[in-house]
Amino acid sequence: SLQFVADQGFMLNGKIRKFQGVCNHHDLGPLGAAVNVSALRHQLELLKDMGCDAIRTSHNMPAPELVDLCDEMGFMMMLEPFDEWEKAKCEGGYHRFFYEPSCYPSVVPAHPDEVRPHAAERMTWAEADMVNMLRHYRNNPSVVMWSVGNEVPTQGSDEGYKVATWLRDICHREDPTRPVTSGMDQIDNALDKGFAAVLDIPGFNYRANRYEEGYHRLPQGLVLGSETASTVSSRGVYKFPATKRAGAMYPDHQSSSYDLESCWWSNIPDVDFANADDHPWCIGQFVWTGFDYLGEPSPYDTDAWPSHSSLFGIIDLASIPT
């Protein structure tokens, strides 16, 4: 059984617990992006051995094989289908299809104040893709919550809360048993414009110093670290002096493995661990990331050779802890 109780936290089968999760992209590093069940199992075994108990499928619908493995191995899952809604992050992104009519008939009639512009006969692609995901995975016991987006630019819109409400209601309609969250990074906008208030679980991406403010300003009485840390490190590389630094760059394009270096927007993991330990209303976190991945080699994210792998992973591309 799942319970999310205001001021008290998350209960699984009647026992309070904190999410000790990671965010993972869908790829398998040098093995590529095609599903390999043995490689997925290997990743999950490494994560489980270090104490991880939850996976956030950032930021795409998961492979059925991954969900089946999480059912089998006892992981909890946050399933997250979107990295953008109707407002673009990149030229070729999902915003091109979000409100476009799909080939699927509408499940319910459109409301007069409905945010979707294509009203009656066909679902938008956003709704159709959500419904397909929800119906596919709502009977999987590993799935404990749905996330309707990651750092969507729509947070900054005055109408953003309406889109969030629409997606939340689709989740509730198809699965009334699980809560809905979204990974928010525009905390001022999310709090001031009502975006965070319409979610069942407000998910904060980074901004660990804003958790307490969010808890006091929002009605849910809970805060989730939906994406945390983004500490950077390179396996076997140790920089001296060993000091806490943000955005540190070196001629060898590496980062220190002392876990003291982060990016300008992020922090070392100790901050997030303390939030979860000190506040019952903080229900845990999903660290960015469980495994390194190709792309986003911050702090060397300059589109220049030789940097091509992320440095965020607790475990690197070779499946060796950093």
Predicted regions and their residues:
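Extended substrate-binding grooves/exosites of carbohydrate-active enzymes
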Residues: 1-322
